[in-house]
């Protein structure tokens, strides 16, 4: 049985849209608020098994309406959802990631690197949430464990700079990870590369 994944990141919901006038900001906010629903529709249409959201879903502290829009969309997407908070929406005490009651199909990674096993999909998903506005290199000395057919990680990290304060990730770390798929967010530029047996995708 194959595994179908939808991977996205960096929605920055409730961005202030600085530099735009009021009417432009209203239009941009309306368009931005449609992202969760459109993503859920795509997930259902494609019959995805997993929805991976690799950080910065919110730009900062979101409005109540925005949180409810996201929760509703995720509850209706028809997939298991894994979210890793990023540097803009990091998981600190009092964070909505900790305080909100998320739908049953949603798992938010709220601390250091951890794994969730899904036996019915023969899959193990790793992830970690930012605790502050920066993150150490989480894949340093990391090696995926378990006998599952699919070993996946979702992280908010930077594969372009070894000295990045935002979870720097090197090709060697990816190669040594033992993962089949690494889902990244952060750099706002889509792309992919193979390192060993791992496919690494950076999503926007």
Residue ranges and their predicted role:
Residues 1-69, 147:
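N-terminal active-site segment of His-dependent metallophosphoesterases
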